[in-house]
Design a protein with these regions (language model features):
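Mid-domain Rossmann-like dinucleotide-binding core that forms the NAD(H)/NADP(H) cofactor-binding site
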Residues: 136-216
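Glycine-rich cofactor phosphate-binding loops and adjacent beta1-alpha1 units
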Residues: 189-191, 197-271
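Glycine-rich beta-strand-centered segment in the early N-terminal region that forms part
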Residues: 19-36, 48-97, 133
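C-terminal hydrophobic helical "lid"/dimerization subdomain
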Residues: 1, 280-327
């Protein structure tokens, strides 16, 4: 099959022929119809992190059609339309059996620890696909996986409730765009920040009460902050919390080292929550939300051959929502 491949890390992606991965007894082969980009695509090429196995096919997210099934697979058949869950786990350890797959010692991410979705097809365990949400486009179906799952778990772990206030920093990125939509779906009053005026305007058009320039003192105090930027927004995120507020962090795209005043933490009665990806049951719940009409922000779509152009747009931070490859 043909795929985008990274032979060295750091390195450059190339498009070429790679062997078809074998289908194990409990695997399915999915013919990819659409795949979505994530920051992981950029990080792998920079060697941050360095993939454990090279060469590797990038791509965490995809939607497609089942093309083959393993001999022990009973829940899927050739022709089924599915979405790929990029959160990998063993499925049989105590944590997995208890529904806490994100704590599995073998937990991994598709497209980082094993070859991913920017290819003609991807082979994945039968538990890692769900039925494609009815009424959603292929592009939308490919776009909610990694970032949507991360945002959903963050808001659940922060116990966001209807009527509470939520601040989403760096709106326009994949996690932030998903958090905006999910927060609104959960009945919260949502605020956002961005460096870009156009993104602030888009956030308000999508339902945010207000959007403010990143890095400036915020005129509101909120119950929950969702932050995926790290160092550049850390101080303002903490400063935006009400007494007893919760700060959920999933990334450090702008820097991974921050300073924390412990007296501020305890006198503010704040909760700090580290979170990434989600469990299989949370992916099922998110998929049901998407099927019921949850907004999925798709910035633009490219042909598979246009992966370099899509990467350039992602690198420049020009997008609002997800960048998608049509296969």
């Amino acid at each position: 099959m043909y795929a985008w491949v990274l032979d060295h890390s750091p390195g450059e992606y190339r498009y070429g022929e790679v062997p078809d991965p074998p289908v194990g007894p409990r695997d399915v082969r999915v013919r990819v119809v659409a795949s979505a980009l994530n920051r992981m695509d950029l990080w792998l090429a920079r060697g941050m992190p360095k993939p454990p196995v090279l060469p590797v096919v990038p791509g965490c997210d995809a939607a497609g059609v089942v093309a083959a099934v393993g001999e022990e697979v009973s829940r899927w058949a050739v022709g089924d339309e599915v979405v790929v869950n990029p959160s990998l786990a063993c499925g049989h350890c105590p944590e997995c059996l208890a529904g806490r797959s994100v704590y599995c010692a073998s937990w991994a991410i598709l497209g980082e620890h094993r070859s991913g979705t920017h290819a003609e097809s991807v082979v994945i365990g039968e538990a890692n696909v769900v039925s494609r949400p009815t009424g959603r486009t292929w592009e939308e179906s490919a776009s909610y996986g990694l970032c949507g799952l991360t945002a959903y778990r963050m808001l659940r772990r922060a116990h966001l409730s209807a009527g509470e206030t939520l601040l989403v920093t760096g709106v326009g990125g994949g996690v932030a765009s998903a958090a905006l939509a999910i927060g609104l779906q959960m009945g919260a009053t949502v605020y956002a920040t961005s460096r870009h005026e156009a993104k602030r305007e888009r956030a308000v058009a999508l339902g945010a009460v207000a959007a403010f320039p990143s890095g400036e003192p915020l005129p509101v105090k909120v119950d929950v902050v969702v932050d995926s930027s790290g160092e550049p927004t850390w101080a303002s995120s903490l400063g935006a919390l009400k007494k007893g507020g919760r700060l959920a962090v999933c990334g450090g795209t702008g820097g991974g080292r921050v300073e924390l005043s412990l007296p501020k933490l305890w006198f503010g009665q704040y909760e700090l929550i580290g979170s990434t990806m989600g469990t299989f049951s949370e992916f099922d719940e998110l998929t049901r939300l998407v099927a019921s009409g949850l907004s999925v922000a798709v910035d633009s779509a490219f042909q598979l051959a246009g992966y370099p152009e899509a990467l350039a747009r992602l690198r420049a931070g020009q997008q609002f929502g997800k960048l998608v490859l049509r296969h």
